[in-house]
C-alpha cells in the first residue's frame, strides 16, 4: 500500500488534527500528514483495523500533546535539557481505546505482534496506550515495552 493509500485508509478512523499538535494543525492544516512517518502510519492502520478493531483517540479537546509535538508545545518548550522523543519525530501517539484499558490494549497488540509491519515500542505501566515506531539499537523484539 502506498503512503497516499495508507493516509486515505486512516482517514476513516482519524483526522490529522487528532494526530498532530494544535500548533502544527493551525499552520499546516490537512498538509500536516507530511510530518507523520510512513512506518508509523502503516503501523497505526494495522493496529486500528486488525488488532484493536475499536475506536482509538489521540488528541482531544482536553488532551492535545499526545501525537506529534512541535517546539511550541509545553511538553517540549518547558524542557531545560536536550529532549528527543518519537513524538517530535512524527513516530508516536498516546491513545485511549474505547472499551479497553491501556493494559488490555497492550496485551492485544502483543498477542497479535505477527500482524505488525514494523517493530514498535509501547510504554508500560501507564493509563494510556503509547505506540511508537522509533528504531531501537540492539532491540530485536517486535514489541518492546519500556
Identify the meaning behind each predicted range.
Residues 1-57:
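Active-site acidic/histidine clusters and adjacent loop/turn architecture
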Residues 83-146:
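Catalytic cores and adjacent binding grooves of peptidoglycan-active enzymes
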Residues 19, 52, 71, 114-116:
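Compositionally biased, intrinsically disordered/low-complexity regions enriched for serine, proline
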Amino acid at each position: 500500500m502506498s503512503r497516499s493509500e495508507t493516509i486515505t485508509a486512516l482517514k476513516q478512523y482519524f483526522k490529522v488534527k487528532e494526530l498532530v499538535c494544535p500548533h502544527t494543525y493551525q499552520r499546516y492544516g490537512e498538509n500536516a500528514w507530511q510530518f507523520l512517518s510512513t512506518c508509523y502510519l502503516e503501523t497505526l492502520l494495522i493496529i486500528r483495523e486488525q488488532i484493536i478493531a475499536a475506536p482509538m483517540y489521540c488528541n482531544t479537546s482536553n488532551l492535545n500533546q499526545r501525537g506529534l509535538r512541535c517546539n511550541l508545545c509545553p511538553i517540549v518548550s518547558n524542557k531545560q535539557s536536550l529532549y528527543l522523543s518519537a513524538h517530535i519525530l512524527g513516530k508516536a501517539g498516546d491513545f485511549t481505546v474505547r472499551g479497553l484499558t491501556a493494559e488490555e490494549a497492550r496485551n492485544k497488540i502483543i498477542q497479535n505482534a505477527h500482524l505488525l509491519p514494523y517493530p514498535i515500542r509501547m510504554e508500560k505501566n501507564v493509563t494510556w496506550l503509547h505506540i511508537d515506531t522509533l528504531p531501537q539499537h540492539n532491540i530485536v523484539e517486535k514489541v518492546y515495552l519500556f
